[in-house]
């Protein structure tokens, strides 16, 4: 997903000026575009960065604020006005909103499709074959309270472990770049791997999957982008511009040949000049978002509401999926484009 907060890239003073009204800290460019601060992911291109490069934004300008690997931290930064928007696993989004943070999901941000997913790997010689074998053992995850933890606990529950037994499975937080090594050296017993880390680890051999998010829930959107409610109210045009552009960029990824996607990503990474390794792009497979245009569905949030209620982390009835998200800005949901059309609303060849 996204990487640890690093340095800030400021918009040049000649380009950006502080808005005299509206949400505190909101800036505009000299030509009146709203500046959207965000955190990215090193060595990769996010859908909204792609949207900017494709020219899909008309009313907004992105401003990079470093990288992060923690979805919960990313959306917390958005909720506390350090950023204009963030992205995280839907379970973390539900917890944030249920806890009183005034944010709303506006677009799916990641998921699992046929080619891209998260796998939970064990060594071939580990002797681990079932969920019960994990009792007393360690699972390496990128952060707590997010995708890897929820998927792991849900799989253990579905495999018949009691709450007490699940509590004996230890989650160990590790940087994604170190997780494979920790597995191979015996520091952990299961490694949550995705993207380039999954592909390179599998290529080296000696490991296999114990479970995957795709096998647990099928092709599914797992995360969303959120904006603060006050920002949505005061700058609806900017939010609408971000959503329509990013939704179209996601659709572009869904219908464009892989070689063209990788070439475009490489060009974007070279142009932004952050000294990143483009060699990882060869492992790109797909957007990971199965729904055309990243339209949000009730079930993608309700399933985690139910999970939190079942695990006594949320009171039943406190929130529903419809309290958490809106599709009103998404052109693939609001009638602007046919639901399965291309990035410009055109018919897509099958």
Give a label for each model feature.
Residues 59, 112-113, 215-217, 287-296:
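Short, solvent-exposed loop/beta-turn-alpha elements that line the ligand-binding surface or hinge
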Residues 68-72, 87, 142-147, 177, ...:
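Soluble non-cytosolic domains of exported or imported proteins
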Residues 91, 126, 177-270:
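Pocket-lining segment of extracytoplasmic ligand-binding domains
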Residues 305-350:
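Conserved C-terminal helix/tail region of periplasmic/extracytoplasmic solute-binding proteins
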